[in-house]
Amino acid sequence: MTSSEPASPEIEQQANSAPRRPRILLAASGSVAAIKFGNLCHSFSEWAEVKAVATRASLHFIDRASLPKDVILYTEEDEWSTWNKVGDSVLHIELRSWADILVIAPLSANTLGKIAGGLCDNLLTCIVRAWDYSKPFFVAPAMNTLMWKNPFTEQHIMSIDELGVSLIPPVTKRLACGDYGNGAMAEPSVIYSTVRLFFESRVQQSGNIVQQPV
């Protein structure tokens, strides 16, 4: 077949059904562990298409220069600046539909409480409120030991577990405040390997390359 000849229907069908990289939506909320968000984005971008979301509080800790150049970071301002009139796309719905997997790392005590209570007062919590829970959703909490041990935290973790959210537990180490105890976010390498192993196992079981967004 020469370059001027049209592709056969069989070839076009194969091209349309070719595997694509998983689409990962990474999000950071307001914990000092957000200083590792750039490393997390780099880990995932080697394997998947990545888009990122940051709450206003998390921006105190995120070094934008540390993010991969091909990763777009969406903030609260983008939620409003991209919509002008009825019929325009809504950012939190667009991101929810685009992603195969949602990962919040770090998940602060405040954002955990909002999600558990169904609140949606910023870009990230609106994405969560609109999320399709048949798609994987991981959280990696990060907070002071006293906050992690608080009875409210236990209730909130139970609430999101009932939704099908997967917990990547915090670890015990020296915390940012100087205390030693449980509550530190798992390392980016652990978060990445946990999500990738889960996703690839799910793909093998289903026989699909990726779960297509709804």
Curated annotation (Swiss-Prot):
Kindly state the tissue distribution recorded for this protein: Mainly expressed in stems, to a lower extent in flowers, leaves and fruits, and at basal levels in roots.
Task: Write down the required cofactor(s).
Answer: FMN
- The reply to whether Membrane figures as a keyword in the UniProt entry is yes
Question: What GO terms describe the biological role, i.e. biological process, of this protein?
Answer: coenzyme A biosynthetic process; positive regulation of response to salt stress; regulation of root development; response to salt stress
- EC number(s): the record gives 4.1.1.36
Which major enzyme category is it? lyase
Effect of a null allele:
Reduced coenzyme A (CoA) content. No roots. Decreased salt tolerance.
**Swiss-Prot/TrEMBL catalytic activity:** N-[(R)-4-phosphopantothenoyl]-L-cysteine + H(+) = (R)-4'-phosphopantetheine + CO2
Looking at the UniProt record, the site noted as Important for catalytic activity sits at 177
Query: What pathway is this protein said to act in by its record?
Result: Cofactor biosynthesis; coenzyme A biosynthesis; CoA from (R)-pantothenate: step 3/5
Give compartment(s): Cell membrane; Cytoplasm
Which keywords label this protein? Answer: Cell membrane, Coenzyme A biosynthesis, Cytoplasm, Decarboxylase, Flavoprotein, FMN, Growth regulation, Lyase, Membrane, Stress response
Tell me which residues bind FMN: 30-32, 55-57, 108-111, 142
Q: Which residues form the active site?
A: 92, 177
GO CC terms, sorted: cytoplasm; phosphopantothenoylcysteine decarboxylase complex; plasma membrane
Which InterPro entries is this protein grouped with? Flavin_trans-like, Flavoprotein
Q: Which SUPFAM superfamilies match?
A: Homo-oligomeric flavin-containing Cys decarboxylases, HFCD
- Cofactor comment text: Binds 1 FMN per subunit.
Query: What drives induction of this protein's expression?
Result: Accumulates upon salt stress (NaCl).
**Pfam families of this UniProt entry?**
Flavoprotein (PF02441)
- Presence of the UniProt keyword Lyase in the record: yes
Residues engaged in binding N-[(R)-4-phosphopantothenoyl]-L-cysteine: 144, 174, 176, 185
Which superkingdom, per the lineage?
Eukaryota
Q: What does this protein do?
A: Involved in plant growth, and promotes salt and osmotic tolerance, probably via coenzyme A (CoA) accumulation and endogenous proline accumulation. Catalyzes the decarboxylation of 4'-phosphopantothenoylcysteine to 4'-phosphopantetheine, a key step in coenzyme A biosynthesis. Required for roots development.
Q: Which family does it belong to?
A: Belongs to the HFCD (homooligomeric flavin containing Cys decarboxylase) superfamily.
Q: What is this protein called?
A: Phosphopantothenoylcysteine decarboxylase HAL3
Gene of this entry: HAL3
